[in-house]
Amino acid sequence: DCIPGGENCDVFRPYRCCSGYCILLLCA
C-alpha cells in the first residue's frame, strides 16, 4: 500500500501513489 503523494513509493524513481498502488509517472 501507499499514501497519496508518493511518500511510501520508490523515492529514486518517478513513481506516484494511485488508488493504493505505486505506478510510474502519472495516474491514468
From Swiss-Prot:
Modified residues (4-carboxyglutamate): 7
Broad class of where this protein is predominantly found: secreted
SS bond partners: 2-18, 9-22, 17-27
Source species, domain of life: Eukaryota
Signal peptide: none
Subcellular location, record wording: Secreted
Tissue expression: Expressed by the venom duct.
Keywords noted in UniProt: Calcium channel impairing toxin, Disulfide bond, Gamma-carboxyglutamic acid, Hydroxylation, Ion channel impairing toxin, Knottin, Neurotoxin, Secreted, Toxin, Voltage-gated calcium channel impairing toxin, Voltage-gated sodium channel impairing toxin
Positions carrying 4-hydroxyproline: 4, 14
GO CC annotations on file: extracellular region
Entry's Gene Ontology molecular function annotations: calcium channel regulator activity; sodium channel regulator activity; toxin activity
Domain-level remarks: The presence of a 'disulfide through disulfide knot' structurally defines this protein as a knottin. The cysteine framework is VI/VII (C-C-CC-C-C).
Role noted for this protein: May inhibit sodium (Nav) or calcium channels (Cav).
Protein name as annotated: Conotoxin de7b
Originating species: Conasprella delessertii (Sozon's cone)
